[in-house]
Amino acid sequence: MAELTTIARPYAKAAFDFAIEHNAVDNWAEMLTFAALVSENETMQPLLNGALANTKLAALFINVCGEQINKQGQNLIKVMAENGRLSVLPTVSKLFSDFRNEWAKEVEANVVSATELSLEQQQHISVSLEKRLARKVKLNCSTDTALIAGAIIQVGDLVIDGSVRGKLSRLSDTLQS
């Protein structure tokens, strides 16, 4: 994973810098997300890892993407194909999204709760995180009944485990030591 990130970072940074310069950050985010989906397609995977000539691969990839990718996006695809890097497009898209969120002072928070959260609870969590992190927060909520009760909130490297399962696990660790 670290190697993919190292390979993808220069492409993501170049795309992000270009998008900032041309006031097209959201457009580039959409293009890269779409291109990443195309590259992850099971039909496309063998071609990305196969012996197809890089120029033909770039042309095929651009043809598949159609009008979803503009001229500058096509140029990025061509450069990545020439360097044999189209397979890292999902990582490029993720890094671009990270750069965008940092630039816009936004973060994504993954909230896993034992039961579905009401809109009021989601808003309370969002407001609390915004105060703590000094950033705009976008919640991604899901449920996991194995938590028993409570929730686990993850924002980047920060993990807040307020679940009963987590508390029981910590109690068990304490008793065993």
Swiss-Prot record:
Membrane topology recorded in Swiss-Prot or TrEMBL: Peripheral membrane protein
Cited SUPFAM superfamilies: N-terminal domain of the delta subunit of the F1F0-ATP synthase
Protein name: ATP synthase subunit delta
Record lineage: Bacteria, Pseudomonadati, Pseudomonadota, Gammaproteobacteria, Alteromonadales
Keywords: ATP synthesis, Cell inner membrane, Cell membrane, CF(1), Hydrogen ion transport, Ion transport, Membrane, Transport
A single cellular component GO annotation: proton-transporting ATP synthase complex
Function: F(1)F(0) ATP synthase produces ATP from ADP in the presence of a proton or sodium gradient. F-type ATPases consist of two structural domains, F(1) containing the extramembraneous catalytic core and F(0) containing the membrane proton channel, linked together by a central stalk and a peripheral stalk. During catalysis, ATP synthesis in the catalytic domain of F(1) is coupled via a rotary mechanism of the central stalk subunits to proton translocation.
Native species: Shewanella sp. (strain W3-18-1)
Location(s), subcellular: Cell inner membrane
Alphabetized InterPro entries for the sequence: ATP_synth_OSCP/delta_N_sf, ATPase_OSCP/d_CS, ATPase_OSCP/dsu
Family note: Belongs to the ATPase delta chain family.
Any matching Pfam family: OSCP
